Amino acid sequence: MAYDLKDINFRTVSDPKGFIDECDGVYAKRVETAADMIIENSRRSPIVLLSGPSGSGKTTTARKISEALERRGVRAHYVGMDDYFRTVDPATAPRTPEGDIDFESPLCLDMELLNDHFSMLAEGKRIYIPKYEFSRRMRVIEPSKSIKLKKDEIVVFEGIHALNDLITQKHPDAFKLYISARSNVEFNGEVVFKGTWFRLIRRTVRDYKFRGADPDQTLSMWANVRRGEKANISPFKNKADFQFDSSFPYEMAVMNEAATKLFSSIPEGIERYDELRQVLPALQLFGVIDESLVAPDALIREFIGGGEYE
């Protein structure tokens, strides 16, 4: 699927609010479809595994699906799989080809504990979810929360490695969902904005606004993030029971001004430099929409702030 730049810019000027609402409505229908499919599968398993690469909007989508299930009378619990990261041990941590610790590797997760928890939940037992502090790269003693599923309740586990064979082979009946922002933008049949750039820009803006990371830091990690996606995430997407695109035609117009500032100076020598320097001129092809027009529950609020899921 590809979006048309001329149509995007026309709607940006002529009816920005209507444009946003229409795009958000398409996404909302995908969420509702996923909720219906999850309920149908709940006879087989109460577990939902939601995966997708960085910047796909997994957290918001997981919460929206949980809300859709609640509207159908099904209580849903949410668990972020990031809390299952192991305490980093430099002696045993997986490494990138360059020798750095590979935080994109599924081996950073405590797969044994995850699989035990999935089995315990299916058996009606209580689990105690660990708590991970990214600032110290370690698991803390106190658990983040506990969950015990009652009859007809569902739990949504969200994380980049949720569809990895190390999990799904042991729990084949779990409902598997994959999301990613992946539509290109075209002008006269030519790709002028790559689908992966939606996620790159989302990640760069979010990390700058909320994680104290300057753009050089985020962009320097992008090559390894993409390597990790190709090795550890994308190969498992076809195992999903349902896939959908989480990009929005209007979002670059909303994020344009913030992203333009962050991409105005890309350090030479950075890996994938030739690709990254194409992002700024591509951004200049889009118009601008005031972010105040974006609803508080919109997915892109996960990246620009001001959302109700923060």
Could you describe each region identified by the protein language model?
Residues 48-50:
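Hydrophobic anchor at the beta1->P-loop junction of P-loop NTPases
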Residues 1-33:
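Charged, amphipathic alpha-helical linker segments immediately N-terminal to NTP-binding catalytic cores
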Residues 115-173, 219-236:
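Glycine-rich phosphate-binding loop used to anchor ATP phosphates in small-molecule kinases
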Residues 77-79, 86-135, 154:
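Conserved nucleotide-sensing/catalytic segment adjacent to the nucleotide-binding pocket
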Residues 67-77:
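Post-Walker A helix-loop "phosphate-sensing" segment adjacent to the P-loop in P-loop NTPases
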Residues 58:
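Conserved lysine of the Walker
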Residues 61-65, 80:
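Hydrophobic positions on the alpha1 helix immediately C-terminal to the Walker A/P-loop
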Residues 16-21, 28, 162-310:
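Conserved NTP phosphate-binding and transfer environment spanning the P-loop NTPase/kinase superfamily
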